[in-house]
């Protein structure tokens, strides 16, 4: 019921609302329901994500470098915690936090409001979409007892339907979709990813007290380089915001080229800096060194 009939019906509800309102989208809005295990493969722990991976890498590779956002929905008619969350890639977190500041969350749905989490996780299709170079989000569903007691079982039924939660998610993601549709450039703040990387380097250093001296000597220079990249990324994001807020003029050919370049950078960030540990948690490649046994 929750996984994932409610998500599919929510897609229909959002699109019907846009059509009935007469809204004319600026971008093409593609509606996809591609996460069913029937699309999966045998003897694979990633069967649930095979549908999304095949869609974006094999069936529609032309989406890569063109689509500015992916909104994924999972179990959206049940409150998995007292606080709702939009989970996204690092690069979209700042934009989403500012978006959420103007959202009124009904207390009967989520008493503790709404927050933004990053990075995305592997247990839903937005991960496959993101590593193809499309900035992705999902309504966070990983917390709470439902995932341990009812998920993927016959107990996932209409008894756990929460209308206030479902209505709020309809309204929240319709508003987010329209907000994204009105942007000129994809709202990507690359500094967030590099800041997380800087923190990760420091954590790895602390975990490797017996690292070779030549490695330890290079760490300060590495951290300084990351800081400089963050400064450049901050300036880039300021320019993106200026264009999206229409505080500076930009002709369409230039904007189209900028959008493609931003999405190209995003794809490279995924290619170079996103890896998984043995528990399928997202981490940085250099973090693997801290998982190796010491001599």
Question: Which residues does each predicted region cover?
Answer:
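Hydrophobic transmembrane alpha-helix bundles
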Residues: 27-29, 33, 62-77, 104-113, ...
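Short, structured coil/loop segments at alpha-helix boundaries
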Residues: 49, 60, 84-97, 104, ...
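Mature extracytoplasmic or organellar-lumen-exposed domains after removal of signal/transit peptides
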Residues: 190-191, 197-295
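Sec/Tat-exported extracytoplasmic proteins
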Residues: 15-22, 33, 59, 103-107, ...
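Active-site-adjacent substrate-binding region
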Residues: 67-70, 75-195, 199, 206, ...
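Acidic/histidine-rich catalytic neighborhood of metal-dependent amide-processing enzymes
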Residues: 1-91
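Short, Lys/Arg-enriched charge-dense amphipathic segments
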Residues: 47-58, 92-96, 131-143, 205-224
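A sequence-level detector of short, solvent-exposed, charge-rich linear segments
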Residues: 29-37, 44, 74, 86, ...
């Amino acid at each position: 019921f929750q996984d994932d009939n409610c998500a599919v019906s929510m897609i229909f509800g959002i699109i019907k609302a846009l059509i009935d309102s007469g809204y004319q989208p600026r971008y093409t809005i593609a509606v996809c329901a591609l996460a069913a295990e029937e699309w999966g493969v045998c003897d694979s722990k990633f069967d649930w994500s095979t549908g999304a991976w095949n869609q974006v890498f094999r069936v529609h590779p032309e989406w890569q470098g063109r689509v500015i956002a992916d909104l994924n929905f999972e179990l959206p008619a049940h409150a998995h915690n007292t606080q709702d969350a939009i989970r996204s890639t690092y690069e979209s977190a700042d934009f989403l936090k500012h978006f959420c500041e103007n959202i009124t969350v009904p207390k009967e749905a989520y008493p503790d409001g709404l927050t933004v989490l990053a990075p995305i996780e592997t247990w839903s299709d937005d991960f496959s979409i993101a590593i193809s170079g499309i900035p992705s989000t999902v309504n966070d569903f990983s917390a709470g007892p439902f995932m341990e007691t009812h998920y993927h079982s016959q107990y996932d039924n209409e008894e756990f339907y929460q209308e206030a939660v479902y209505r709020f998610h309809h309204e929240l993601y319709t508003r987010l979709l329209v907000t994204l549709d009105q942007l000129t450039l994809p709202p990507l703040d690359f500094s967030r990813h590099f800041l997380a990387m800087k923190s990760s380097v420091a954590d790895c250093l602390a975990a490797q007290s017996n690292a070779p001296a030549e490695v330890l000597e290079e760490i300060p220079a590495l951290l300084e380089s990351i800081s400089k990249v963050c400064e450049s990324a901050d300036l880039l994001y300021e320019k993106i915001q200026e264009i999206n807020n229409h505080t500076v003029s930009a002709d369409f050919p230039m904007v189209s080229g900028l959008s493609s370049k931003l999405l190209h950078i995003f794809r490279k960030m995924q290619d170079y800096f996103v890896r998984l540990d043995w528990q399928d948690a997202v981490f940085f490649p250099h973090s693997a060194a801290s998982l190796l046994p010491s001599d």
